């Protein structure tokens, strides 16, 4: 059970780190698209996990996805607010 808890915590931490890294990458812009797979790689996620993270944040309306196959994403105003308010 502890190993599962650790895995869940790490997954949650990477999701939060992804949103923060995206925020830093685009300097809090809500109009600048960037490569979500690259952002995922910088926070330790492989392509499969990065796609799951992208899907998660898109579902929560924290990011907009231009193209899932290329992983092009941008922050939404809600995403900026989430990062800035912690």
Predicted regions and their residues:
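Short, amphipathic alpha-helical interaction segments positioned at domain boundaries
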Residues: 77-86
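Short amphipathic alpha-helical interaction segments
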Residues: 44-59
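Short alpha-helical segments that sit at the start of domains
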Residues: 1-22, 28
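Minor-groove-contacting beta-hairpin "wing" of winged helix-turn-helix DNA-binding domains
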Residues: 70-75
